[in-house]
Amino acid sequence: MLGVLAIIGVLSVGAIAGYSKAMMKYKLNKQAEGLTMLLANCIPLSKQLPAVNEWKIYTGILPKLNLLPDSISIIRSNEMKDILGIESYFYHTSGENEWGIFYYVPESSFGKEICYNLIKTVKEFHADMYYIFRSKNRTDTYHGMGT
């Protein structure tokens, strides 16, 4: 009897782990889909933004222009959150067509997969993006990579 319960317990743990991994894969796909749509919407917008002297955050105008995909929501006036809970903002800088999306990717068990997913998705738009920035939180120094 205990052997049967032990086998059921092991199978249950395996099923839960498999379900968790499958759900994360689903969310990563949804994140990539949302980011692709967001970038496709932001590229034309970025070319219409006025010149600025410093960084300027434009996240707040995205919902007003109906440019946010369903999987991304505004959480503060200048920040958005995707299906994985990753916070980000859309910005424009002083250079011509220099814009981007800054991501806060916290350390987590799936942090590496999330970063890989973001970079893989953004690579499709490399001709229109200047930098990719990422930070663990608001107090961490940012890490960027030019295209």
Task: Show where each model-derived region lies.
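N-terminal single-pass transmembrane signal-anchor helix
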Residues: M1-M24, Q31-G34
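Detector for methionine-enriched segments
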Residues: M1, M23-M24, M37, M80, ...
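Short, charged/polar micro-motifs that form catalytic or ligand-binding hotspots
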Residues: K25-L28, S108
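N-terminal alpha-helical signal peptides/signal-anchor transmembrane segments
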Residues: Y19-A22, A32-V52
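Periplasmic/extracellular, small/polar-rich flexible segments of pilin-like filament-forming proteins
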Residues: Q48-T147
